[in-house]
């Protein structure tokens, strides 16, 4: 793709998200979502192959359905309140439709079906945008309609997402699908605490974006998309492999890494609000995620897959790809846990 065209498309994606985040009018929010969706489809189809085309079509269909639901919720709200301003939704039906439309855009269960398929069909760089930047707009709208969200509905969606995000990733060997299921689980954690402490949701979102960006950058640097190709990176770049493994464990929420901090704070927040069974269930289900990350780490670090002698010589050659931000991102995605006492002011 022509670099100028790519820059224009990326700017449109960013503009769409920014319009959604700063608007106080429902129609502008809807327009922002549409701009964002139509601009990201060419980015997904950068590589002209049938898989990318299929993934883009799936993405387009699900996002269009979510946009229609969103517009329907906006119109129902308009009928009851008589205004377009973004504020408390007066009608429970409008609130439910809006929550479901945003859950569909975020890829939360039971509307998660498109996330693994789409992420698997597109290049790593497009997958990075899909699983990080694309979460900002729907999350900001959820944040704005907080007072009118149905607690039972949002907690059901979050528990389903955490469970499916854990179970779905168990039998995967494709790294992009593992990242997609991880994204579903993380969305579940974020929305679970949304009504108790929205600032905690933002903290979780920031840490999730940092960890996912680091992960995808490392995958792009090593050109790895499967467990097998990840196991061969020992021969190509031993230090890079160690970084991949530590970041993977951080994504699984293993203490004392960064990924443990949001989980710890969310469980603490929910316990403070006299919710005991729910955080217990969430913590148990999070072990599924940790299990498939541990298994990936084990298969890469402690088992030797068959490889040729030529492959074993690759460590001698310097890496040609420049990754300026990688050291900073790796530190942020693994070493933020000591900052937890400072962040306790978020409460």
UniProtKB/Swiss-Prot annotation:
It comes from the Eukaryota. It catalyses: a ubiquinone + NADH + 5 H(+)(in) = a ubiquinol + NAD(+) + 4 H(+)(out). Pfam families: NADH_dehy_S2_C, Proton_antipo_M. GO terms for cellular component: mitochondrial inner membrane; respiratory chain complex I. It is found in: Mitochondrion inner membrane. Core subunit of respiratory chain NADH dehydrogenase (Complex I) which is composed of 45 different subunits. Interacts with TMEM242. This is NADH-ubiquinone oxidoreductase chain 2. It comes from Ovis aries (Sheep).
């Amino acid at each position: 793709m022509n670099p100028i065209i790519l820059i224009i498309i990326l700017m449109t994606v960013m503009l769409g998200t920014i319009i959604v985040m700063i608007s106080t009018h429902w129609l502008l929010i809807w327009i922002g979502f549409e701009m964002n969706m139509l601009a990201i489809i060419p980015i997904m189809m950068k590589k002209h192959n049938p898989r990318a085309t299929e993934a883009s079509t799936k993405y387009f269909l699900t996002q269009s359905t979510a946009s229609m639901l969103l517009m329907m919720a906006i119109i129902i709200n308009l009928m009851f309140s008589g205004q377009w301003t973004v504020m408390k939704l007066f009608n429970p039906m409008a609130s439910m439709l809006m929550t479901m439309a945003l859950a569909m855009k975020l890829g939360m269960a039971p509307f998660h079906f498109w996330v693994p398929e789409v992420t698997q069909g597109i290049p790593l760089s497009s997958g990075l945008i899909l699983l990080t930047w694309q979460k900002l707009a729907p999350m900001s709208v959820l944040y704005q309609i907080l007072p009118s969200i149905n607690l039972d509905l949002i907690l059901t969606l979050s528990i389903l997402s955490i469970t499916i995000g854990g179970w779905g990733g168990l039998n995967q060997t494709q790294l992009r699908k593992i990242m997609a299921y991880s994204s579903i689980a993380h969305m579940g954690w974020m929305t679970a605490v949304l009504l108790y402490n929205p600032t905690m949701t933002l903290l979780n979102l920031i840490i999730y974006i940092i960890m996912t960006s680091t992960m995808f950058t490392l995958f792009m640097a090593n050109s790895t998309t499967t467990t097998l190709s990840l196991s061969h990176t020992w021969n190509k770049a031993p230090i890079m492999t160690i970084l991949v493994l530590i970041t993977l464990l951080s994504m699984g929420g293993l203490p004392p890494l960064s990924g443990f901090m949001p989980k710890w704070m969310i469980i603490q927040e929910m316990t403070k609000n006299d919710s005991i069974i729910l955080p217990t269930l969430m913590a148990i289900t999070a072990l599924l995620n940790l299990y498939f990350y541990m298994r990936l780490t084990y298969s890469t670090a402690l088992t030797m897959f068959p490889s040729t002698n030529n492959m074993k010589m690759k460590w001698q050659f310097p890496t040609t790809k420049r990754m300026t931000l990688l050291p900073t991102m790796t530190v942020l995605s693994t070493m933020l846990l000591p900052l937890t006492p400072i962040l306790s002011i978020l409460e």
